[in-house]
Amino acid sequence: MQPETQESLSTRFAAQQEIQLTLIEKESYDLKDHLAYWKAVRLENVIAYYARKEHITKLGLQPLPTLAVTEYKAKEAINIQLLIQSLLKSEFALERWTLAETSAETINSSPRNCFKKVPFIVNVWFDNDERNSFPYTCWDFIYYQDDQNKWHKTEGLVDHNGCYYVDLNGDFVYFTLFQPDAVKYGKTGLWTVRFKNKTISASVTSSSRNTNPSSESRVGLSTSSSSESPRRRPSISENSNTESPTSSTSRLRERRRREPRESGTTDTTPRRRGTKRKLGSDSAPTPSEVGSRSTTLARHGYSRLGRLQEEARDPPLVLFTGQQNNLKCWRNRCTTKYASLFLCFSSVWKWLGPNSDGGAAKVLVAFKSDAQRQVFLNTVHIPKGTTITLGRLDSL
């Protein structure tokens, strides 16, 4: 085998570039052609990497990038090759695919390592101000792999929290969240989402509880069409109820009578996806809670009273109780897909001793704030038969 020279490397290097140009000019819609293109990209960068290792800085008239750049591009091409080869074995191989839809820019954009088609822009107005806005990209069609590397096709969706898709298990997989940028670039912690002639905004209303004379602020979502007049724009409150307060109250009382009492108290919290939630205190902190918080709040987005109450609390957490195998699989899924929605996860554990609850498995999840905890509970699918207990700890 003859050693490679600069001339032989230049010839092979130019041949791979010629293959790429031919495939680009072909404007094919066949995945096999796109696979050949990325094979040529991989070989081009492998040759460039080898030349750089041999202290060759040019092949022909073209200067070569650094070793780190050629290594990265070669690995990137290998990854895309593997993804296309896998997609070729799926039912979506016969669909119309452009070279741009298999490009590195598309595959590396969120959601990463997924194929996407038909992008659309989602404009987010921080502080509900058009002058303080940022465009995000979502997709009409998203192709993703499950745990068995099988491809599935779904639609890209948008809500007030961010851009997401719903996977085969019914879980909401968020690949873009607006809240971190709202805290970073906004002052009020509020934002408006506009896309496809639709508008989703947070409207602040006030309500009071019979057991507490002080009013509390609640944020609800409203959606509308951007083509309507702002003054006459009808708002549709999320989870709204068109029944009268009297009928809602009577139904709540009936539900309270049907549910069992535990330790002299009644759990009136609505059930979500077959789970029972035991609520901790979400009102003002007690004197013993003051000064024990170990995390720092965002600079904006709280009223003066709300900031004082939140800073006085400990970091919030949720205790999940259920079957051991279900909790283990669920924990692995959460740490993979929803790492941005919590602070830390515990391992699966059990209480011991004669007073334990029959060996039920438990998982603790800690959060940076009450808002993050609420987003987690609203987003993540909880395993069936799992109970939820909200609480706080002095330290983690």
Curated annotation (Swiss-Prot):
Phosphorylated. One of its GO terms (biological process) is DNA-templated transcription. Residues 203-228, 236-250 have a biased composition (Low complexity). Residues 314-396 are annotated as: DNA-binding domain. Its main location: host cell. It is found in: Host nucleus. Gene3D superfamilies: 3.30.70.330, E2 (early) protein, N terminal domain, subdomain 1, Papillomavirus E2 early protein domain. InterPro entries: E2/EBNA1_C_sf, Nucleotide-bd_a/b_plait_sf, Papillomavirus_E2_C, PPV_E2_N, Reg_prot_E2, Regulatory_protein_E2_N, Regulatory_protein_E2_N_1, Regulatory_protein_E2_N_2. Residues 1-207 are annotated as: Transactivation domain. Keywords: Activator, DNA replication, DNA-binding, Early protein, Host nucleus, Phosphoprotein, Repressor, Transcription, Transcription regulation. Residues 202-298 are annotated as: Disordered. Binds DNA as homodimer. Interacts with protein E1; this interaction greatly increases E1 DNA-binding activity. Interacts with protein L1; this interaction enhances E2-dependent replication and transcription activation. Interacts with protein L2; this interaction inhibits E2 transcriptional activity but not DNA replication function E2. Interacts with protein E7; this interaction inhibits E7 oncogenic activity. Interacts with host TAF1; this interaction modulates E2-dependent transcriptional regulation. Interacts with host BRD4; this interaction mediates E2 transcriptional activation function. Belongs to the papillomaviridae E2 protein family. This is Regulatory protein E2. It comes from Human papillomavirus type 48. The lineage of its organism: Viruses, Monodnaviria, Shotokuvirae, Cossaviricota, Papovaviricetes.
